[in-house]
Amino acid sequence: MKSILLIGLGRFGRHIAQELNELGHQVMAIDSNEDRVNAVLSYVTNAQIGDSTSEYFLRSLGVGNFDVCIVTIGGNFQSSLETTSLLKELGAKLVVSRAERDVQAKFLLRNGADEVVYPEKQLAKWAAI
């Protein structure tokens, strides 16, 4: 069982939270939107409303204590990039971030992401098989 910090609870983040729960992991879920946080309460260990671009907020979570930090923020690349960078600066062990394009992946990898996932690209490859 791993402890996971999941940041961003849109469709992709919500599905990740469900899968991680089914696999028996402990998940702390974060989003700035109260409705999104409330939507995942039944299948995460803990959830908080907060600004992931705030160093103070992330520091209060103790990001270095999680096995994995997953950033699934979509639609606001600047927030995703800032969050990724802050996580690494604050001692995150493993940071996995979401990208929609190759150029985003390059920026994320240069700024703290250990791994990058492309949900739309990976789904397109799967559908084309």
How should these model regions be labeled?
Residues 1-129:
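Cytosolic regulatory regions of ion transport systems
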